[in-house]
Amino acid sequence: MSLSFKAHVQILLKEHRGERVFRFEYLGKYYWLKQPEQLKGIWLLLKPHPKQHFKEECEILQHLNNIGAPVPKLCDFSDDYLVLEDAGPTLNIWLNDETLSWAEKLHILHSAIEILINLHQQGIIHGRPAIRDIAWKDGKISFMDFESHSKSHNEHWLITRDILAFLD
């Protein structure tokens, strides 16, 4: 990305300090800026090491972008933020859109399940492919928020868990 994009991101970081995720526009395109969680109280015990988890999320996104997986484009990142290109509305938004026919909704869902199966065939596990974490734009499915932190090495179990999360 251009230096001016990076400069714009730095300004946004100052304006949105502590805001976990927000959408912004730059030169007519939309992006999402995400920052590490800032946990307090009991959440520190329930979700320890938020900076480490954020770093792992960046590494996963880098890898998935490099292999051409169906994820939003990672445009910029550091230890303190990441910027993703907007991948469109999520499936839950599409499915609640009363202007779409059931045939159109089924087409979107069918596309998502085909891509999820394709990910699994490549040995990629999502961890929790909820419809709120799957976007659809211009006929293209993108998966977000990979959460495969399971200690299990049983690929069949992990794939089954993904399918159950998708169907939930």
Features from the language model and the residues they span:
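Short helix/strand-bridging catalytic loops that position acidic/His residues to coordinate divalent metals
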Residues: 45-46, 97-101, 147-155
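Conserved hydrophobic alpha-helix
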Residues: 64, 112-119
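A short, low-complexity linker immediately N-terminal to eukaryotic Hanks-type protein kinase catalytic domains
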Residues: 1-9
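Conserved structural core of kinase catalytic domains
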Residues: 37, 50-54, 58, 65, ...
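ATP-binding glycine-rich loop module of kinase domains
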Residues: 8-55
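C-lobe/activation-segment region of protein kinase-like
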Residues: 137, 141-168
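Short, glycine/acidic-enriched loop or turn micro-motifs at the edges of active sites
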Residues: 88, 131, 148
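Catalytic-loop of the protein kinase fold
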Residues: 121-133
